């Protein structure tokens, strides 16, 4: 935060150089995340695509990578995408992304995650916006999450 503040205040020396370095690292991590998912592939469920990055993609950028997969050609825009990544506290961070077209068809990822996490219980938490949302679950809840989330989306999207 200090770096960003100093750059906004006009620093074009040390802090600007640091900001450029941080930006380059961020772009590198995104590029590597996209390449990893192109290599590993994305799985397809009835109502969504998903991938489990484990700890290979930082949980802080896994949602960005998920959204970028639409533009990279790795997935079509006909279903939302769900991304799993390990969080530092040994929980699983879930990031979901949709498209404007899916929103027009009734998609609400925030609601779907909230409902799914309520059914999972055991400290699962989720919510967000129609087009992008997130959740945190225990690692042993991934399979149940996929099934419940699939059912939740079936009740939303209409052709």
Indicate residue ranges for each PLM-predicted region:
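Glycine-rich, acidic loop segments that terminate in or are immediately followed by a histidine
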Residues: 46-159
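A structured phosphate/pyrophosphate-recognition subdomain
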Residues: 1-46, 50-56, 70-73, 84-87, ...
């Amino acid at each position: 935060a200090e770096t960003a503040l100093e750059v906004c205040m006009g620093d074009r020396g040390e802090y600007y150089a640091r900001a450029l370095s941080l930006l380059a690292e961020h772009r590198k991590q995104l590029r590597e995340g996209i390449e990893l998912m192109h290599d590993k592939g994305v799985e397809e469920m009835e109502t969504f695509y998903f991938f489990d990055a484990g700890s290979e993609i930082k949980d802080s950028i896994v949602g960005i990578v998920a959204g970028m997969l639409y533009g990279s050609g790795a997935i079509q825009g006909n279903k939302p995408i769900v991304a799993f990544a390990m969080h530092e506290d040994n929980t699983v961070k879930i990031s979901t992304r949709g498209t404007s077209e899916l929103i027009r068809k009734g998609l609400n990822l925030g609601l779907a995650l909230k409902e799914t996490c309520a059914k999972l219980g055991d400290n699962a938490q989720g919510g967000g916006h129609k087009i992008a949302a997130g959740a945190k679950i225990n690692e042993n809840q991934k399979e149940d999450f996929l099934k419940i989330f699939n059912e939740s989306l079936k009740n939303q999207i209409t052709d």
